[in-house]
């Protein structure tokens, strides 16, 4: 049995939905109860999602500040993102976050600033004919945006957008953030910078090789580890390079797979369904409580986000449920099956939650306050 009450803040009306087996009941403002009978679990999910989305489009919002771990704290309609990348910018030290979407036929790109309960603090028009692929929140109160392969800096105070790192579009960018560190690619060099202390941590000149794969133009990928001791990058077909950010030492891992991620303690690096010790690059057995399919290709789904010992893992398809694991004890804490994901979603941890930006045009927050 699942029941949720949505509130429309503009009209103060309530809308309630109840799912009992294969029966859906809805009720607007204490009026007549409508009953929908379904003949399968799939139909229940589909019709319930559709009913909730219909009300959310009218301004109804679901909020539950007392949600248990893995339960929804908020569902809100923001509007479909025309570019399909569903960018989010979060950080593990704060609960507020930023979501960007392209409105209409690239008429505008809108940046939303949400608080941890899902209230909109601010919306900013970034302008027409923009396409932000990804964005990160830096400790100096700026966002770095990858706008169609051009890195730009957005000030949260002045709302000014300025060019950052690469001045011309070379179809090659890297952008990642972990703690106070941010990683980016200038078109010639990978840079890791600490915005909290305003110091450069590491810099390396690399040339990204052209790709033979029709899905992307260049091998150009870089990421930081959860504890900020390592970086990983890929600029050629068959190998990843792991960098120790303190010593500058490098380990080369021969692997042409996809979907890399680090363990919460930075000791293991996984890519293409294989596992390696980050210090030596030696192969190792799977240290995680969840299995990972070997030989992961570009089009497969294996998305992993980390906060402390927590790992949010989505595998198989972009619409698959997200598993929330506690790696300190190997426990599966929750399985998040968001009703507003059609084919894919982007998700990221905040200080106490997991935020989803979905292709149905919704923003959901799930409680991860341990």
Regions flagged by a language model, labelled:
Residues 103-108, 146, 185, 234-238, ...:
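Short, solvent-exposed loop/turn segments at conserved positions within beta-propeller repeat blades
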């Amino acid at each position: 049995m699942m029941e949720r009450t949505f509130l429309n803040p503009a009209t103060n009306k309530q809308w309630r939905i109840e799912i009992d087996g294969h029966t859906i009941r809805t009720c607007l403002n204490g009026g007549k109860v409508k009953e929908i009978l379904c003949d399968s679990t799939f139909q229940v999910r589909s019709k319930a999602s559709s009913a909730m989305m219909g009300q959310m489009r009218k301004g109804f919002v679901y909020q539950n500040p007392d949600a248990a771990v893995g339960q929804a704290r908020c569902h809100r309609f923001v509007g479909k993102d025309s570019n399909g990348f569903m960018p989010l910018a979060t950080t593990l030290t704060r609960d507020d976050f930023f979501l960007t979407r392209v409105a209409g036929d690239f008429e505008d790109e809108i940046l939303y600033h949400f608080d941890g309960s899902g209230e909109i603090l601010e919306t900013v028009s970034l302008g027409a004919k923009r396409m932000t692929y990804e964005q990160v929140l830096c400790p100096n109160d700026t966002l770095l945006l990858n706008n169609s392969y051009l890195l730009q800096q957005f000030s949260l105070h002045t709302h000014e957008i300025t060019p950052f790192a690469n001045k011309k579009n070379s179809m090659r960018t890297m952008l990642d953030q972990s703690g106070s560190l941010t990683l980016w690619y200038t078109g010639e060099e990978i840079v890791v910078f600490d915005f909290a202390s305003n110091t450069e941590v590491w810099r390396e000149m690399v040339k990204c090789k052209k790709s033979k794969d029709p899905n992307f133009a260049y091998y150009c990928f870089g990421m930081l580890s959860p504890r900020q001791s390592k970086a990983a990058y890929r600029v050629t077909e068959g190998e990843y390079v792991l960098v120790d950010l303190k010593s500058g030492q490098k380990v080369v891992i021969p692997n042409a797979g996809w979907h890399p991620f680090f363990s919460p303690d930075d000791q293991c690096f996984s890519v293409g369904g294989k596992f390696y010790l980050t210090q030596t690059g030696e192969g190792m057995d799977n240290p995680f409580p969840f299995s990972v399919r070997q030989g992961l290709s570009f089009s497969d789904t294996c998305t992993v986000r980390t906060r402390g010992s927590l790992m949010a893992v989505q595998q198989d398809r972009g619409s698959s449920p997200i598993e929330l694991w506690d790696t300190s004890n190997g426990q599966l804490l929750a399985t998040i099956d968001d009703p507003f994901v059609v084919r894919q979603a982007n998700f990221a941890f905040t200080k106490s939650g997991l935020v989803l930006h979905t292709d149905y045009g919704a923003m959901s927050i799930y409680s991860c306050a341990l």
